[in-house]
Amino acid sequence: MSNIKVGQFPSTRLRRLRMKDFSRRMISENNLSTNDLIWPIFVCEGNNIADEIKSMPGVFRYSIDNILKELENVINLKIPAVALFPQIDNSLKDENGSQAVDENNLICRSIKTIKQNFPDIGVICDVALDP
């Protein structure tokens, strides 16, 4: 049998870059803040609606008038953008996706209302015309 030689590593590894909190923060690769977040908002037709989505407990689908109340929370949390997910009636969906170019569709009305009240927030959206 041959003797296996162990490497010449020190018994103590001096991790000088991890010793102090300030240096750990300076060299960390990833930092997550509210600036990195996008708040999802589910939108539906109607007035004064806040219906819980059964498959996502604690998550609600809001009518346009109630979106503004939700956006106040988003602004207070300093989240820079929202993503809108509309609930489009199946009768409005067609093979050409004509709802996508209708300036009075649910998503366009939602964006107009949001931008009139919160012009600085970013809005990401989906016309939700999938079958």
Annotate each predicted stretch with a short phrase.
Residues 50-64, 78-105:
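Glycine-rich, proline-tolerant flexible connector loops at the mouths of alpha/beta enzymes
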Residues 1-28:
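N-terminal amphipathic/basic leader segments beginning at the initiator methionine
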Residues 32-59, 124-131:
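N-terminal small/glycine-rich loop or linker at the start of catalytic domains
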